[in-house]
Amino acid sequence: MTAEPNKPCQIKRDYPQLINLYPATAHNDAHYLSKLSIYQQRVFEAHSQQKLLVLGQMGLGNGLELLSWWRTQTNPNQRLLLKVFEPNPINAYELKLLWDQSASLAKVPELELLAQCLLHTEPTAIIGCQRLIFDDGRTTIDLHFGDIQSQLSSLIHSPLHPVQHWLVLPHLQNGLHQQIHWQMAKLSDDSATVATIGLNESSGLSETTVNRFQACGFEVRDFTCAEIQTNPQPDAILLHERHVLRRQDAKAYAFNPMAAILSSDAPSSIAIIGGGLASAHLALSLAERGQSTQIFCKDAKLGQGASGNRQGAIYPLLTPENDELSRFFQQAFLFSRRRVQALTSAPAPNQTPISHNFCGVLQTAHDERSQLRLDKIIQSQNWPSEIAYRVDAQQANCLANINIDKSGFFYPLAGWVCPYEYAEAALQKAQQLTAVKLHLETEILEIEHQSEGWYLITAKHRFGPFAQVVLANGAALTQFDASNKLQISPFRGQVSHVPAQFQLSQLATVLCANGYLTPSHEGLHCLGASYVKEPKHLDFCPQEQQENLAKMHESYPNQPWLEDIDMSGNNARVGVRMVTRDHFPMMGCAPDVAQIIKDYAEHQLTKESRHYWQTTPAPVHEGLYILGGLGSRGLSSGPLAAECLAAQLCGEPIPLDKATLCKLNPNRMWLRKLLKGKAL
């Protein structure tokens, strides 16, 4: 693993603590897993006609049930989404320690390869959902860590793909109270069942717990039962209670409409405008779901906009409060990191090269204000050490392999990635999975909505109709009438390319302070970047080149290696990133601003205005979506934002909570005011 376990801060719990929190279900793993596999095969057989089977599991245990679900899924025409809820977060190092010390995998060697694949994704001990994708999307595992009721209640019910079946592990069975049962029911199909392990043994459910599950409309059965019933309808009263819960959720978040679901019968029903990281990853996430796309790129090849830099830092944005922004970026960073690993480690000939190095990112302060901010971030939360940990000046020097003589915050799983190669690799993988048509040198000048769908218009051609159109066109996001009111701003960024020489060439990690500096790649370091709002041109700027150098001198004054930074070649690249005021990307339905203003004029002076905006879906352009505003951290945020939009378009469970989805809503700037009864 990248996060080195030999550092004291990396080891927080020993094996006795772990085995107490994540107990094995049975002493005889081989015998138990044989029975478990038979049960799981019955579950898959009972739902064999579903293209996506969504299953829930309460408790991680020692992880063998999870691995067994994965192994048992053999239907090539079915995808599996397994949602595992575990109150005690665990990281990859601890999971490996648990398996090694218990020798549980040694008893079932057929799971060893899957276990190694799982560890390779580096699960981390963060609160919230971590989405792990395997086998080109055939198996997806959502790890929901933290208080189970909070995790369940934060999720949106998926009408098209609800949870069909639950497995409850013994160590959690009697700790699940009535509110948890109802939240499980809210997310479930009306005919979903619950299976328990050891129902008739001392380790099984109490009669009270069984009654509570049944009171929520679940049929509860031991996993050794010979039959999996798929259609035990709850009585009308219990069914009504479930529907009430779902309506309450829908009403509370009515202002944030979800995407209309794609028709699987329309092979070219979605168009993506843009040729960068966002569009390529959206195409990949849709391809994993069997959905074809058409991509329209104005340039001769991908990655010529903000995705065109040689190197970009990939690490999470943390806040002292660990609020929705911070939690989103942790989830997104980890998802993106896993994407890089999956794309570069696939078996030949499906492997796609991406220049990258997860060498860590070392964040340091550059003045008194930034030091106070960094100290506040470090001290305000008990951050998982695989996310970040504090280092003193000596440790920082060792990590950087050059002297910086400053303490800092080290992100051990972070590093740098080549953005345009990342975009190209995502598209290549998408094209391996399904039909993805790429239109290069095709600049869309206008989009037009007719009754039959959307049309894309160039100087010479008219494409369409498309049921869905996604604007993922970076700096040109606001070029169309339907998107020109988006509250988002362009910022110019000039990245300097400097030769790797002398002490500078020894840099071993990404430095982030006032600007950033990467280790060398193909003989050059990247140093940047300028930050100029609403630029008038994208030409090379000598002043910004010197400003980039000055930022390094301000960040690490009097260090000898600074003299090795040679700017004389005037080698640089200029791009534009689109930035929102709250630093969240934009992902979701395109707002109909004209209609918002019209509705506002009718409701702004009424006492009921706040209630109106709270309970009324915000006006949107039907079939038009936004994926942009990735700012300076698109490498971290872009792939997960694309995955979530793909899940919405296909009517699948989304790996984000309701509050975070509202933060990503392109409508959010107006709605924040309207929901508070304030003037626009």
From Swiss-Prot:
Catalytic activity: 5-aminomethyl-2-thiouridine(34) in tRNA + S-adenosyl-L-methionine = 5-methylaminomethyl-2-thiouridine(34) in tRNA + S-adenosyl-L-homocysteine + H(+)
Function: Catalyzes the last two steps in the biosynthesis of 5-methylaminomethyl-2-thiouridine (mnm(5)s(2)U) at the wobble position (U34) in tRNA. Catalyzes the FAD-dependent demodification of cmnm(5)s(2)U34 to nm(5)s(2)U34, followed by the transfer of a methyl group from S-adenosyl-L-methionine to nm(5)s(2)U34, to form mnm(5)s(2)U34.
Alphabetized PANTHER family for the sequence: SARCOSINE DEHYDROGENASE-RELATED, TRNA 5-METHYLAMINOMETHYL-2-THIOURIDINE BIOSYNTHESIS BIFUNCTIONAL PROTEIN MNMC
A GO biological-process term: tRNA wobble uridine modification
GO cellular component: a single term: cytoplasm
Lineage, uppermost ranks: Bacteria, Pseudomonadati, Pseudomonadota, Gammaproteobacteria, Alteromonadales
Protein name: tRNA 5-methylaminomethyl-2-thiouridine biosynthesis bifunctional protein MnmC
Region (tRNA (mnm(5)s(2)U34)-methyltransferase), start-end ranges: 1-267
Keyword Oxidoreductase: yes
